[in-house]
């Protein structure tokens, strides 16, 4: 692992390849926690059924970005919404199709880049993602503008990401992850690379201020910033997320924003 600058083409190639290759392992490790028909915002286990961050969903046209296996989109369909699930990875969309067969809940699946959404202006009432797309694109401000374009005036944009303060720590769920070792202001991405030094996984860091400026710059109004607390009785570990760290500082930030009505 290293922290270094990576070009846009290399980022796209790396992350598409990573999620295609890792899709089976990811679902094997996390599929039970995420469910086939559920909307889980984060490793802390906050569910949309309890949080209600999207507001009313019945009858709404909802786009799920970076949908993975599209459990959230299927849950939305079960609540009466009209969702579309989008992901860059064919491997993850294969799992989405398989889960649709298991549950009998089918939603449109689209393979596309979050920086070039294949939809008309104002096509959706709501756009959402749980840890999808935004941390993995080269230009997340441009992704915000694309979301604003496809969202109708008055529509809501809700997304969760790793809490920016987590980037000062090592990616370690244990004691080693309690000591600050990185500058919060170093925006160099987290990069995993092969033996030839070619990036195989890239994740971007932005500060809280960066995220707010991206939203405002795209024309959004921030309604809420949710930092889910680690729930009592939750002893699961997901990558760097753990009870030890979760009880001390936040691991997830959920931004709730609105495109102002004209």
Language-model features: locations:
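Short alpha-helix
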Residues: 202-225
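Class I SAM-dependent methyltransferase SAM/SAH-binding core
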Residues: 60-116
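A short acidic, Gly/Pro-enriched loop at the edge of an enzyme's catalytic core
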Residues: 115-126
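A short SAM/SAH-binding and catalytic strip from SAM-dependent methyltransferases
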Residues: 125-140
């Amino acid at each position: 692992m290293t922290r270094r600058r990576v070009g846009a083409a290399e980022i796209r190639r790396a992350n598409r390849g990573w999620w295609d290759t890792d899709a089976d392992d990811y679902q094997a490790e996390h599929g039970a926690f995420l469910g086939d028909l559920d909307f889980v915002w984060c490793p802390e286990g906050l569910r949309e059924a309890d949080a209600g961050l999207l507001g009313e969903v019945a009858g709404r046209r909802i786009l799920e970005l970076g949908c993975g296996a599209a459990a959230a989109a299927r849950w939305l369909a079960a609540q009466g919404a009209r969702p579309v699930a989008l992901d860059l990875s064919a491997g993850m969309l294969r799992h989405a199709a398989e889960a649709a067969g298991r549950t009998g809940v089918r939603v449109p699946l689209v393979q596309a880049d979050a920086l070039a959404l294949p939809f008309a202006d104002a096509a959706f009432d709501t756009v959402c993602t749980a840890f999808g797309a935004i941390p993995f694109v080269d230009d997340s401000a441009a992704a915000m503008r694309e979301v604003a374009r496809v969202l109708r005036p008055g529509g809501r944009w809700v997304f969760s990401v790793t809490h920016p303060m987590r980037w000062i720590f090592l990616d370690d769920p244990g004691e080693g992850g309690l000591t600050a070792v990185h500058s919060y202001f170093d925006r160099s991405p987290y990069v995993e690379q092969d033996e030839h030094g070619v990036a195989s996984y890239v994740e971007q860091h932005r500060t809280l201020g960066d995220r707010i400026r991206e939203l405002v710059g795209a024309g959004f109004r921030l309604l809420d910033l949710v930092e889910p607390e680690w729930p009592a009785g939750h002893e699961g570990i997901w990558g760097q997320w753990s009870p030890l760290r979760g009880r001390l500082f936040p691991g997830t930030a959920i931004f709730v924003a609105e495109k102002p009505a004209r």
